[in-house]
Amino acid sequence: MNRRPFHFVSITDRELMQKLSDLHPYAKMLPQADWAILVCGDESVSGPFYMDDCAAATQNILLAAHSLGVGAVWCGVDHTERQQSFGELLGLPEHIKAYSLIVLGMPAEEKKTLDRVEPDKIHENRW
């Protein structure tokens, strides 16, 4: 179908970044970041399936950031008061739902890449 229900809010305003950080317990690094992107979904376009498209869009942004040497953190925006608070703060229309907050910036330090391959979770043809 390729309905593309996602929208993006680019956030660079320091005061706004602080307010968002206050609303999200896992985004405390936000006030020190260079930039953030709020990934949102249009529920009127694809109902609850907007979440799948927003997850793919979020992952693509993370991969692009990594390829450019930019640090990025995916902070989920759950479907409770936090989603409503983000919507009110950023003026989102009722049918637009905050999905994820991506915090971006140049890394302060280089970290070793972890090997997270778990062979016991890979199955071929059958379980």
Positions of PLM-derived features:
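Acidic, surface-exposed loops and disordered segments
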Residues: M1-W127
